[in-house]
Amino acid sequence: MKKQHIINETFLDEILAQKLGTTYIPPTGIKDADFEQAAKHFINLLLRADGLKPIKTAVVHPIDKESLLGAVRAAQFNVIKPVLIGPQHKIESVAKVNDVDLENYQVINAEHSHEAAKKAVELAKKREVSAIMKGALHTDELMSAVVYKENGLRTERRISHAFLMAVATFPKPFIITDAAINIRPTLEDKRDIVQNAIDLMHMIKEDKQVRVAVLSAVETVTSAIPTTLDAAALSKMADRGQIMNAIVDGPLAFDNAISLFAAEAKGINSPVSGNADILVAPDLESGNLLAKQLKYLGQAVMAGIVLGARVPIILTSRADPIDMRVISCVLASFIYNQTKAKLHIQASQ
């Protein structure tokens, strides 16, 4: 009988079993080596988060297996303290089916998903929670409550989304932004998108040198492709201090950003080529396509987070497996704990 070829998307099971003192039963079949290699980067990130204070997190509309167990598993790793907001009878039903004891978690009843999103934002504004986690609802439904002008969570920064990605064929994790929030960002929007991603990368990267590749279809500046003009402007803005704490170069085509060989073959001399930490997409469509191509064709492991709001917002695709939701919670934990530490240092000076 032919063995089944699998991708073990519950790659945190063994670590969790050790943490809880339970028996680990590995999945049957042949493991996907590329996926496992990529997952090692995220396992390292999880281990680095061990010891950080868990953050109280409003989980919005967790009425399916993935959204509920994603929050529960993150709680088992002591990354978050979930506050489950949604129709209580539906939460209880999915908990019963998946053998989750809700006695350990606070549940706030909300009849509909939009009401759950509104309540989560209210808790964040009152500082009763330190993060928000998307459950089984549409992104625009959650983000409408977040960006609402009267009672939302806006700051002076443009809100943006970042995917943290890892693939076996690239030596380190990298960010793709923005692939979920800003559809056709202006130059000013892109400045904030880039700065948000830089700030995140500094929180999670042990080597503090951050390199940003601003992507377009070509590596030369031409008015025929307006995104090359934006890329060139962003690069110069970094030179002038309008974008801080990173080397920014663009326009760069994807191959030139990822492959030093491709850049050298085209005669491109860039400090970013082959060593990018952040890939800035021209628009949402191209960024979303790039991230999902890497996930489904390149066996990428990915986590998603919304930046620039008053609290980190854990935002993944509804099709994302449980462990990728856990790693997204880890990103929120890094943001919360390091921001809190920075504010403490500033207050003591």
Swiss-Prot record:
Q: Which GO terms describe its biological process?
A: acetyl-CoA biosynthetic process
A GO molecular-function annotation: phosphate acetyltransferase activity
The family annotation for this protein states:
Belongs to the phosphate acetyltransferase and butyryltransferase family.
Query: Organism source for this protein?
Result: Rickettsia typhi (strain ATCC VR-144 / Wilmington)
User: Where primarily located?
Assistant: cytoplasm
Its EC number(s):
2.3.1.8
Catalysed reaction(s)? acetyl-CoA + phosphate = acetyl phosphate + CoA
Q: What is this protein called?
A: Phosphate acetyltransferase
Question: What SUPFAM superfamilies does the record point to?
Answer: Isocitrate/Isopropylmalate dehydrogenase-like
Alphabetically sorted, this entry's keywords are:
Acyltransferase, Cytoplasm, Transferase
Q: Which GO terms describe its cellular component?
A: cytoplasm
Report the subcellular localization: Cytoplasm
Instruction: Give the gene symbol.
Output: pta
Q: Pathway it acts in?
A: Metabolic intermediate biosynthesis; acetyl-CoA biosynthesis; acetyl-CoA from acetate: step 2/2
